[in-house]
């Protein structure tokens, strides 16, 4: 049985979906919580509250490890929609649209809600060519293209975020790799 198509002038035919905004370096201001680009390599930390111009349906070229520390609401990650609350940890792959919308915010907003680490694929891929140990990251990063939610990692993920944020140079890279190693172990145990 088929259903007749609505006339082309109907409201449903005119309904348009909103495409995610592609975020780029030019609109990543330190005023929004980003680290200055001259102070970071391929690993960037970000902390922000809610509401903020950063909370919107968007995507970007980098992977994003996203941790929620306050409020609850609805998460939109790729084609998945579900609840979030403090402790929500997700790894989003490049160009995977995402947004977290808080539903329980006080009138004055929340100063700290999100802890984020963004990183590029290229440097990791290049490192895999000469440093075989990096290859253990690739299955995790492949799965992240559709988003991976991690349960029970909030405290350790936040601790790793602060360690990465406070570190510079090779210590920052080592702290970042420790953070990814935690995710790799967890993902292997919870397939």
Label the predicted regions.
Residues 1-89:
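Generic protein-terminus/edge-of-domain signal
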Residues 4-27, 32-37, 94-162:
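A hydrophobic/aromatic-rich effector-binding and dimerization subdomain
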Residues 42, 62, 111-113, 173:
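A structure-centric signal for secondary-structure junctions around beta-strands
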Residues 46, 66, 101, 118, ...:
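Residues in well-ordered beta-strands of folded domains
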Residues 59, 131, 170-173:
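Short, solvent-exposed loop/helix junctions and linker helices
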Residues 69, 119-121, 166:
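Short beta-strand-to-loop capping motifs
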Residues 84-100, 176-179:
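Conserved long hydrophobic alpha-helices within structured protein cores
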Residues 148-152, 162-191:
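Short, Lys/Arg-enriched, Trp-marked, Pro/Gly-tolerant hinge/linker segments that flank
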């Amino acid at each position: 049985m088929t259903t007749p198509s609505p006339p082309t002038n109907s409201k449903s035919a005119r309904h348009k979906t909103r495409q995610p905004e592609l975020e780029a370096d030019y609109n990543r201001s330190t005023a929004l919580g980003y680290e200055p680009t001259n102070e970071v390599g391929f690993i960037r930390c970000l902390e922000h509250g809610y509401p903020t111009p950063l909370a919107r349906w968007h995507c970007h070229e980098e992977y994003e490890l996203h941790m929620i520390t306050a409020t609850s609401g609805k998460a939109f990650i790729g084609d998945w929609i579900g609840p979030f609350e403090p402790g929500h940890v997700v790894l989003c792959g490049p160009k995977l649209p995402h947004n977290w919308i808080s539903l329980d915010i006080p009138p004055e907003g929340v100063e700290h809600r999100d802890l984020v680490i963004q990183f590029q694929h290229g440097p990791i891929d290049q490192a895999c060519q000469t440093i075989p140990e990096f290859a253990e990251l690739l299955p995790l990063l492949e799965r992240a293209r559709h988003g991976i939610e991690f349960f029970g990692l909030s405290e350790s993920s936040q601790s790793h975020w602060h360690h990465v944020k406070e570190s510079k140079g090779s210590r920052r890279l080592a702290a970042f790799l420790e953070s990814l190693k935690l995710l790799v172990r967890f993902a292997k145990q919870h397939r």
